[in-house]
């Protein structure tokens, strides 16, 4: 038993020894290998590498240490030898040199090319030598330069001419040969290269994986804590040391700065003492002269223990503001942290005078008071306490507050909106910023001072503003404003008048009601009231009031664009009409209907005339029947008035409306009366200024409930209304030839038809002598063109409505 195979163990007396019988006694070698053998050492390889051939041979060579040395094998890579191939390549003409190490002299010898010619190159060289002389070395240099200049992409012919300093014919011949040979060669280059790999384990081309160089080193000792936690602790320790070093460097720099500041302060004090500047006049003059040279004044701050701030320099810019911070009185003994005073803005910079120059100030005494670094005060950042004036600010937290250290420009008065406070700027932007006294029509009341502006969709928005005259303005009745006659007023919109604007809160005395009315009458106070355009001047004013590119929408007509005309005959009112094309189409349809009626009447008269000769008795009965089915004027009026029922203005209001006329207040036309215009969304004003259609509404005044009869004046094409006179003369109830339902939107709900109206409608429907008028008539087609549903007073009689003759 050798020492190498024996492992020493501590003897244990309590452990029983094994007892073997003679026939069961194992061999000594087997017993030693089982009990006392050294355990197999770990190979240090991965599991998939332990079965490799080279590793197993090395392990087996380690185990045969007791055998002869000849049987021990050191694993090495296999090497193959081919002597015949070697002798064929290298012939035995080798001569032993005199010395193996040959040192060439250090001279400028030409570098030998790495490219070696082969038999194919020699053939080309012999062919080229017939025309010109070229040496093999010269040919190798040319190929070598082309190879080294090319990587994956070959050089071009022009680049080859720059590389090779030879004849163009020679360069072209060699270049073409090199390109052809390079393409035929499947390798990366024509120059053979030795495989030189780094032995750091980065390449995996080694076939012997077991003997590769290990990039990751195995951890052999477990007692060192090189884990992540210890690494983080080391990083934290390094950061703390770096921070301590940085703090020491900053303290060192601060102390140097303080020492330099102390020396400079002593020099300034000595110079002032020699000059006799005990009051600081010369020092202030020097500061002012320096501030005039600078374009933007920058405050200079002394970084001492008291945090004293020098007064900032001032400039003479007309709209420039400088900020000045007062020196805080700090008590060093208690080390208090006082609140910094609020910065005050200086509107104008004044020149220093002997009266305003400071003689001795406590801050000047503390300016030269220094203390050591251990008494440095670190200013505590406190949240600003809201002051009473800030709490009372209407803007609240959004109020503008000046920041310390910032410079602001003074507001320019010529660009501010203070026309009401400054009389000189009262006329600036008067069309944009003026507010005038405003009166509304519905409801009729005075809303005070307001300003008009256009909102989304062309809607007019009133911006009201409160003044101290609001209690008086609420007492104004719009009828007072309507009583002013426009004929006796001379409207002047020049800027010479001192207008009272909406923001007249700052007026000294409150005006009375009579004074306000007198100001309105004399055009000293602007007054606005909405108006409705007349029919006679709507065409002329439409071109001037409408903006370029603005069109009249058929579905939305503003109240100002709907014409209103009152006539004195029969109480007939005319409201806004249809377009020119619709009017012409309607005229053609009416003419065609009249022709059809006349043709049918002539045919029936002929048939009646023939029947009168054969049946004289039947003639009288048929004549009486025809007369009974013909309605008179009063019956037609009563039947048509039962179709639509809506409230209309009273007679007193209509009379007042006719007698009042059109009034102007400050050049604005006032509406006449209190009647409301019927507003129809499916009717539009005519775009032609010369031709306009009208819609007639008959007002019946003798009944208990007023009624509106929609009809259309179509007596003849020559009775087209052009102005008020023509319209008044053209509107006659006896001229109405056709009555058809009109799509009129009435604000109030239509009442139910009376039984008498139903009977009259039934009789009219049973008349076979008069043709029916279907809903596809002219005015009904207008509603279909506007894509709106027909809203008739009598839905049940809409299909049976007939044209009636009025005698």
Curated annotation (Swiss-Prot):
Q: Does the keyword Ribosomal protein apply?
A: no
Instruction: Kindly list the places in or outside the cell where this protein is found, as annotated in its UniProt entry.
Output: Nucleus
Identify the coding gene. Answer: EPC2
Q: Where is this region: Disordered?
A: 376-396, 600-628, 645-673
Family, per the entry?
Belongs to the enhancer of polycomb family.
Its function? May play a role in transcription or DNA repair.
- Record's keyword terms, sorted: Chromatin regulator, DNA damage, DNA repair, Isopeptide bond, Nucleus, Phosphoprotein, Transcription, Transcription regulation, Ubl conjugation
Q: Name one GO biological process term.
A: chromatin organization
InterPro entries linked: Enhancer_polycomb (IPR024943), Enhancer_polycomb-like_N (IPR019542), Enhancer_polycomb_C (IPR009607)
Q: Which Pfam families is this protein grouped with?
A: E_Pc_C, EPL1
Coiled coil ranges = none
Q: Where is the composition biased (Low complexity)?
A: 600-613
Q: Which domain of life is it from?
A: Eukaryota
For this entry, the protein name equals Enhancer of polycomb homolog 2
Q: Which GO terms describe its cellular component?
A: NuA4 histone acetyltransferase complex; nucleosome; nucleus; piccolo histone acetyltransferase complex
Major place of residence: nucleus
């Amino acid at each position: 038993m050798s020492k190498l195979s024996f492992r020493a163990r501590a003897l244990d007396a309590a452990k029983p020894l094994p007892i073997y019988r003679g026939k069961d006694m194992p061999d000594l070698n087997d017993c030693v290998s089982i009990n006392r053998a050294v355990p197999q050492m770990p190979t240090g390889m991965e599991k998939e590498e332990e079965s490799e051939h080279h590793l197993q041979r090395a392990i087996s060579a380690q185990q045969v240490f007791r055998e002869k040395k000849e049987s021990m094998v050191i694993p090495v890579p296999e090497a193959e030898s081919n002597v015949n191939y070697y002798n064929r390549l290298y012939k035995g003409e080798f001569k032993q040199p005199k010395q193996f190490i040959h040192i060439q002299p250090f001279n400028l010898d030409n570098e030998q090319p790495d490219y070696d010619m082969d038999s194919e190159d020699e053939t080309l060289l012999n062919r080229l030598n017939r025309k010109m002389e070229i040496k093999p070395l010269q040919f190798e240099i040319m190929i070598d330069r082309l190879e080294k200049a090319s990587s994956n992409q070959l050089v071009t012919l022009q680049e080859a001419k720059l590389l090779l300093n030879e004849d163009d014919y020679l360069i072209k011949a060699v270049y073409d040969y090199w390109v052809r040979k390079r393409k035929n060669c499947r390798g990366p280059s024509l120059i053979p290269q030795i495989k030189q790999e780094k032995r750091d384990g980065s390449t995996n081309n080694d076939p012997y994986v077991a003997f590769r160089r290990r990039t990751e080193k195995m951890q052999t000792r477990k007692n060192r804590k090189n884990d992540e936690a210890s690494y983080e602790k080391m990083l934290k320790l390094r950061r703390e040391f770096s921070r301590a070093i940085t703090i020491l460097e900053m303290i060192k720099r601060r102390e140097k700065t303080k020492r330099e500041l102390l020396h400079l302060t002593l020099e300034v004090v000595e110079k002032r003492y020699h000059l006799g500047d005990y009051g600081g006049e010369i020092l202030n003059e020097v500061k002012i002269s320096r501030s005039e040279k600078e374009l933007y004044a920058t405050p200079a701050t002394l970084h001492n223990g008291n945090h004293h701030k020098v007064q900032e320099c001032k400039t003479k810019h007309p709209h420039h503001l400088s900020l000045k911070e007062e020196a805080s009185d700090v008590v060093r003994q208690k080390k208090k942290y006082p609140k910094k005073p609020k910065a005050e803005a200086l509107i104008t910079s004044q020149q220093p005078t002997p009266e305003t120059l400071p003689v001795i100030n406590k801050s000047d005494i503390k300016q030269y008071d220094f203390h050591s670094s251990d008494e440095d005060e670190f200013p505590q950042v406190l949240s600003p306490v809201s002051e009473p004036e800030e709490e009372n600010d209407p803007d609240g937290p959004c109020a503008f507050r000046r920041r310390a250290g910032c410079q602001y420009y003074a507001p320019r008065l010529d660009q501010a909106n203070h026309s009401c406070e400054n009389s000189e700027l009262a006329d600036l932007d008067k069309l944009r910023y003026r507010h005038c006294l405003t009166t509304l029509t519905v409801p009729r009341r005075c809303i005070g001072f307001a300003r008009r502006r256009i909102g989304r969709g062309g809607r007019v928005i009133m911006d009201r503003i409160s003044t101290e005259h609001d209690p008086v303005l609420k007492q104004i009745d719009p009828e007072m404003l309507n009583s002013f006659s426009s004929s006796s007023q001379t409207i002047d919109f020049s800027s010479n008048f001192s207008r009272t604007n909406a923001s007249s809160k700052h007026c000294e005395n409150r005006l009375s009601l009579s004074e306000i009315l007198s100001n309105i009458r004399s055009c000293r106070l602007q007054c606005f009231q909405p108006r409705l355009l007349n029919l006679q001047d709507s065409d002329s004013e439409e071109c001037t009031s409408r903006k370029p590119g603005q069109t009249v929408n058929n579905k939305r007509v503003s109240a100002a664009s709907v014409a209103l005309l009152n006539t004195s005959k029969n109480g007939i009112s005319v409201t806004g009409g249809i377009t020119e094309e619709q009017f012409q189409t309607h005229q053609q349809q009416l003419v065609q209907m009249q022709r059809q009626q006349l043709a049918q009447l002539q045919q029936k008269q002929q048939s009646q005339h023939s029947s009168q000769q054969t049946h004289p008795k039947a003639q009288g009965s048929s004549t009486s029947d025809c007369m009974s089915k013909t309605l008179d004027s009063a019956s037609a009026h009563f039947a048509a008035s039962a179709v639509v029922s809506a409230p209309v203005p009273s007679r007193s209001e209509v009379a007042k409306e006719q007698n009042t006329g059109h009034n102007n207040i400050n050049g604005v036309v006032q509406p006449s009366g209190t009647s409301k215009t019927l507003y129809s969304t499916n009717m539009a004003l005519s775009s032609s200024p010369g031709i306009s259609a009208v819609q007639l509404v008959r007002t019946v005044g003798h009944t208990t409930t007023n009624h509106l009869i929609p009809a259309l004046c179509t007596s003849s094409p020559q009775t087209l209304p052009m102005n008020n006179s023509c319209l008044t003369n053209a509107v006659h109830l006896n001229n109405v030839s056709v009555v058809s339902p009109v799509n009129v939107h009435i604000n109030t709900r239509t009442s139910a038809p009376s039984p008498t109206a139903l009977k009259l409608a039934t009789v009219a429907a049973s008349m076979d002598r008069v043709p029916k008028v279907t809903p596809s008539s002219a005015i009904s087609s207008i509603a279909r063109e506007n894509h709106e549903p027909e809203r008739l007073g009598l839905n049940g009689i809409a299909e049976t409505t007939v044209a009636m003759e009025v005698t």
